[in-house]
Amino acid sequence: MAPSHWRLILNGKSTDNADLREAVGTLRKRGIQLDVRVTWEDGDAERYVSEAVADGVHTVVAAGGDGTLSEVAAALAHHERDAATLPSLGLVPLGTANDFATAANVPITPLDALTLIAERVAQPVDLLRIDAEHGPRWCANVASGGFGTQVTVETDEGLKKMLGGLAYLITGMSRLGRIDPIGARFNGPDFSWEGEFIALGLGNGRQAGGGQALCPEAVIDDGLLDVTIVPALDGEVAATLGTLVTGGKQAALERVAVRARVPWLEIVSNQPLTLNLDGEPETSRHFRIACVPARLRMHLPNDCPLLGR
């Protein structure tokens, strides 16, 4: 039986979505007590989640892009309760790239996404906990660094609204001649690497930045963090970018990437390093990223590629 009381937290940029409004009405007619809260400024999602927990809501639905999903998931994870006693998590994809939803096969239409939540039992899912100079942060999908992070951070909001995921490609092309390598040391259980890199992916999920499959084999229920490092190899960068164009992004990654799968990873850099945590930048010289097993429960489709069990 579907949970009877849901709270949908809607990104304020999507308040004019007529399909979502109609879908909410349909679910209410099916007997779901479905409240809607709209985010306006920083901190709203966390406050709405706290209210939902206090009110005994069964399911919290993130309606927005990857950033909204991560913000709602992080707000749930901040509560010192285990997954079984927290509200379950649902997703209605309304963002520009919808990287998590795409990789997870979550339906893109609001009614189908809400129906999935009603029909599918929530599954345990992992989250990434990132400890840095400014305290702990949480990440639901992918933490990325290097070239891809700069593309995501620099992509204009207006361009994203007009062109969707194509905006990331245009911004990336404009940066091809100015890729600056970053030096860092990486250490985890049975894994160590040191050198300069141009791209980094730390995956709970598989893709970020408008379809970049940085961690193509990652699953979100194995308690492990997938690591992909693209080194700055002398004489290879131009060839790699050529492969990116002619053979596809994945072929380029497979050509040069260093990969690992670990429960946690420490990163130390002599210069400030910015990680993009599902759209939110965090800058530090020292990071510790841990995969926290089964931190939440989430409604996902039967054929979800991100579930390994």
Swiss-Prot record:
Positions that bind ATP: T39, G65, D66, G67, T68, L69, S70, E71, T96
Positions bound to Mg(2+): V219, D222, L224
Cited NCBIfam families: lip_kinase_YegS, PRK13054.1, YegS/Rv2252/BmrU family lipid kinase
Cystine crosslinks: none
The protein's name: Probable lipid kinase YegS-like
Keyword Magnesium recorded: yes
Pfam families from the UniProt entry: DAGK_cat, YegS_C
